Protein backbone atom coordinates (compact mmCIF):
# COMPACT_ATOMS: atom_id res chain seq x y z
CA UNK A 1 0.00 0.00 0.00
CA UNK A 2 1.26 3.45 -0.92
CA UNK A 3 2.03 5.67 2.06
CA UNK A 4 -0.18 8.73 2.44
CA UNK A 5 0.91 12.36 2.24
CA UNK A 6 1.39 14.57 5.28
CA UNK A 7 0.26 18.18 4.83
CA UNK A 8 0.56 20.85 7.50
CA UNK A 9 -1.02 24.29 7.47
CA UNK A 10 0.32 27.13 9.57
CA UNK A 11 0.34 30.89 10.06
CA UNK A 12 -0.32 33.68 12.52
CA UNK A 13 -3.69 34.23 14.16
CA UNK A 14 -6.33 35.38 11.68
CA UNK A 15 -4.55 34.00 8.62
CA UNK A 16 -7.63 32.02 7.59
CA UNK A 17 -6.45 28.48 8.29
CA UNK A 18 -9.89 27.13 9.22
CA UNK A 19 -11.44 28.25 5.93
CA UNK A 20 -8.63 26.76 3.87
CA UNK A 21 -8.69 23.53 5.86
CA UNK A 22 -12.33 23.11 4.83
CA UNK A 23 -11.35 23.67 1.19
CA UNK A 24 -8.44 21.20 1.33
CA UNK A 25 -10.59 18.45 2.88
CA UNK A 26 -13.30 19.00 0.26
CA UNK A 27 -10.79 19.10 -2.60
CA UNK A 28 -9.09 15.86 -1.55
CA UNK A 29 -12.41 14.12 -0.91
CA UNK A 30 -13.40 14.83 -4.51
CA UNK A 31 -10.17 13.06 -5.52
CA UNK A 32 -11.29 10.05 -3.45
CA UNK A 33 -8.48 10.61 -0.97
CA UNK A 34 -9.24 9.77 2.64
CA UNK A 35 -8.07 12.62 4.86
CA UNK A 36 -7.38 12.50 8.59
CA UNK A 37 -7.82 16.02 9.93
CA UNK A 38 -5.94 16.79 13.11
CA UNK A 39 -4.37 19.69 15.00
CA UNK A 40 -1.56 20.80 17.27
CA UNK A 41 -1.35 21.00 20.09
CA UNK A 42 -3.87 18.18 20.38
CA UNK A 43 -4.95 15.46 18.00
CA UNK A 44 -5.04 12.70 20.62
CA UNK A 45 -6.82 12.29 23.96
CA UNK A 46 -3.63 13.14 25.82
CA UNK A 47 -2.78 15.91 23.37
CA UNK A 48 -6.16 17.57 23.81
CA UNK A 49 -5.70 17.63 27.59
CA UNK A 50 -2.31 19.28 27.10
CA UNK A 51 -3.89 21.72 24.64
CA UNK A 52 -6.44 22.76 27.24
CA UNK A 53 -3.62 23.51 29.69
CA UNK A 54 -1.62 25.46 27.12
CA UNK A 55 -4.48 27.66 25.96
CA UNK A 56 -6.25 28.26 29.27
CA UNK A 57 -6.08 31.85 30.52
CA UNK A 58 -5.72 30.31 33.99
CA UNK A 59 -2.17 29.27 33.03
CA UNK A 60 -1.19 32.65 31.57
CA UNK A 61 1.95 32.81 33.73
CA UNK A 62 3.23 29.39 32.60
CA UNK A 63 7.02 29.27 32.26
CA UNK A 64 8.10 29.42 28.61
CA UNK A 65 10.23 26.27 28.87
CA UNK A 66 7.29 24.40 30.39
CA UNK A 67 5.13 25.52 27.46
CA UNK A 68 7.69 24.26 24.94
CA UNK A 69 8.12 20.90 26.66
CA UNK A 70 4.37 20.34 26.90
CA UNK A 71 3.97 21.07 23.20
CA UNK A 72 6.64 18.55 22.25
CA UNK A 73 5.20 15.96 24.64
CA UNK A 74 1.85 16.32 22.89
CA UNK A 75 3.61 16.21 19.51
CA UNK A 76 5.42 12.98 20.32
CA UNK A 77 2.12 11.31 21.21
CA UNK A 78 0.49 12.80 18.13
CA UNK A 79 3.09 11.56 15.68
CA UNK A 80 3.45 8.06 17.09
CA UNK A 81 -0.18 7.23 17.84
CA UNK A 82 -2.09 9.11 15.14
CA UNK A 83 -0.11 10.61 12.28
CA UNK A 84 2.27 7.78 11.35
CA UNK A 85 -0.37 5.01 11.71
CA UNK A 86 -2.71 6.97 9.41
CA UNK A 87 0.02 7.51 6.80
CA UNK A 88 0.93 3.83 6.93
CA UNK A 89 -2.72 2.97 6.19
CA UNK A 90 -2.47 5.06 3.04
CA UNK A 91 -4.53 7.95 4.41
CA UNK A 92 -3.46 11.54 3.94
CA UNK A 93 -3.05 13.62 7.09
CA UNK A 94 -3.79 17.33 7.32
CA UNK A 95 -2.58 18.98 10.53
CA UNK A 96 -3.57 22.43 11.70
CA UNK A 97 -0.09 23.51 12.88
CA UNK A 98 3.01 21.40 13.41
CA UNK A 99 6.67 21.88 14.36
CA UNK A 100 7.15 25.12 12.42
CA UNK A 101 4.74 26.71 14.91
CA UNK A 102 7.17 25.92 17.74
CA UNK A 103 9.96 27.78 15.97
CA UNK A 104 7.62 30.71 15.30
CA UNK A 105 5.70 30.98 18.59
CA UNK A 106 8.16 29.67 21.16
CA UNK A 107 11.32 30.63 19.26
CA UNK A 108 10.27 33.91 17.69
CA UNK A 109 7.44 34.97 19.96
CA UNK A 110 8.83 33.80 23.31
CA UNK A 111 12.48 34.24 22.40
CA UNK A 112 13.49 30.70 23.33
CA UNK A 113 16.69 29.19 21.96
CA UNK A 114 16.31 27.92 18.40
CA UNK A 115 19.04 25.37 19.15
CA UNK A 116 16.99 24.01 22.06
CA UNK A 117 13.90 23.71 19.87
CA UNK A 118 15.99 21.96 17.21
CA UNK A 119 17.21 19.42 19.78
CA UNK A 120 13.63 18.62 20.77
CA UNK A 121 12.64 18.38 17.12
CA UNK A 122 15.46 15.91 16.45
CA UNK A 123 14.52 13.83 19.49
CA UNK A 124 10.80 13.67 18.74
CA UNK A 125 10.66 13.78 14.93
CA UNK A 126 14.03 12.22 14.02
CA UNK A 127 13.83 12.19 10.20
CA UNK A 128 10.03 12.58 10.03
CA UNK A 129 8.77 15.66 8.18
CA UNK A 130 5.66 16.92 6.37
CA UNK A 131 5.51 16.47 2.61
CA UNK A 132 4.40 20.07 2.30
CA UNK A 133 3.62 22.95 4.65
CA UNK A 134 1.14 25.62 3.60
CA UNK A 135 2.17 28.82 5.35
CA UNK A 136 -0.63 31.37 5.24
CA UNK A 137 0.88 34.82 5.61
CA UNK A 138 -0.99 38.00 6.52
CA UNK A 139 0.16 41.26 8.10
CA UNK A 140 -0.40 41.05 11.86
CA UNK A 141 -2.73 44.07 11.87
CA UNK A 142 -5.02 42.34 9.36
CA UNK A 143 -4.93 39.06 11.28
CA UNK A 144 -5.84 40.80 14.54
CA UNK A 145 -8.71 42.59 12.80
CA UNK A 146 -10.05 39.25 11.56
CA UNK A 147 -10.10 37.70 15.05
CA UNK A 148 -11.40 40.82 16.79
CA UNK A 149 -14.96 39.49 16.80
CA UNK A 150 -14.07 36.25 18.60
CA UNK A 151 -16.09 36.22 21.79
CA UNK A 152 -13.40 34.67 23.95
CA UNK A 153 -9.70 34.70 23.19
CA UNK A 154 -7.36 31.99 24.44
CA UNK A 155 -4.03 32.47 26.21
CA UNK A 156 -2.07 32.84 22.97
CA UNK A 157 -4.56 35.13 21.23
CA UNK A 158 -4.22 37.55 24.16
CA UNK A 159 -0.59 38.23 23.27
CA UNK A 160 0.56 41.63 21.94
CA UNK A 161 1.00 42.67 18.32
CA UNK A 162 4.76 42.82 18.93
CA UNK A 163 4.64 39.14 19.90
CA UNK A 164 2.77 38.24 16.71
CA UNK A 165 5.11 40.32 14.56
CA UNK A 166 8.01 38.26 15.91
CA UNK A 167 6.01 35.10 15.19
CA UNK A 168 5.35 36.20 11.63
CA UNK A 169 8.99 37.13 11.04
CA UNK A 170 10.04 33.69 12.28
CA UNK A 171 7.59 31.94 9.96
CA UNK A 172 8.91 33.88 6.97
CA UNK A 173 12.48 33.05 7.97
CA UNK A 174 11.55 29.32 8.15
CA UNK A 175 9.99 29.49 4.69
CA UNK A 176 13.26 30.85 3.30
CA UNK A 177 15.25 28.10 5.04
CA UNK A 178 13.03 25.31 3.67
CA UNK A 179 11.56 26.62 0.39
CA UNK A 180 10.99 23.14 -1.06
CA UNK A 181 8.70 22.13 1.80
CA UNK A 182 7.22 25.39 3.08
CA UNK A 183 5.03 27.17 0.54
CA UNK A 184 4.44 30.81 1.46
CA UNK A 185 0.90 31.84 0.58
CA UNK A 186 -0.33 35.42 0.48
CA UNK A 187 -3.47 35.07 2.58
CA UNK A 188 -4.19 38.80 2.53
CA UNK A 189 -5.72 38.30 -0.91
CA UNK A 190 -9.36 37.44 -1.53
CA UNK A 191 -10.61 34.04 -0.40
CA UNK A 192 -10.80 32.87 -4.01
CA UNK A 193 -7.24 34.00 -4.77
CA UNK A 194 -5.86 32.38 -1.61
CA UNK A 195 -7.67 29.14 -2.34
CA UNK A 196 -6.30 29.10 -5.89
CA UNK A 197 -2.73 29.34 -4.58
CA UNK A 198 -3.36 26.29 -2.40
CA UNK A 199 -5.05 24.36 -5.20
CA UNK A 200 -1.98 24.72 -7.41
CA UNK A 201 0.22 23.29 -4.64
CA UNK A 202 -2.13 20.37 -4.00
CA UNK A 203 -2.22 19.51 -7.70
CA UNK A 204 1.56 19.07 -7.63
CA UNK A 205 1.51 16.48 -4.81
Swiss-Prot record:
Tagged with keyword Disulfide bond: no
Lineage, highest ranks first: Bacteria, Pseudomonadati, Pseudomonadota, Gammaproteobacteria, Candidatus Pseudothioglobaceae
Positions annotated to bind ATP: 11-18
Main EC class the enzyme belongs to: transferase
The reaction(s) this protein catalyses: dTMP + ATP = dTDP + ADP
Protein origin, superkingdom: Bacteria
EC number: 2.7.4.9
Family assignment from sequence similarity: Belongs to the thymidylate kinase family.
InterPro entries noted in UniProt: P-loop_NTPase, Thymidylate_kin-like_dom, Thymidylate_kinase
Keywords linked to the UniProt accession: ATP-binding, Kinase, Nucleotide biosynthesis, Nucleotide-binding, Transferase
GO cellular component: cytosol
Role summary: Phosphorylation of dTMP to form dTDP in both de novo and salvage pathways of dTTP synthesis.
Keyword Kinase: yes
Name assigned to this protein: Thymidylate kinase
Pfam short name (any one): Thymidylate_kin
One BP term from GO: dTDP biosynthetic process
Amino acid sequence: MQRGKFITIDGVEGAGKSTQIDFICSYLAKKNINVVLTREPGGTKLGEKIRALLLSIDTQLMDNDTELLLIFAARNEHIKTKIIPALNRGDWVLSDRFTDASYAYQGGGRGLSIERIALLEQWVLQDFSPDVTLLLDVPVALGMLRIKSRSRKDRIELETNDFFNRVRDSYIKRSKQFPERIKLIDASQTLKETTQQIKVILQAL
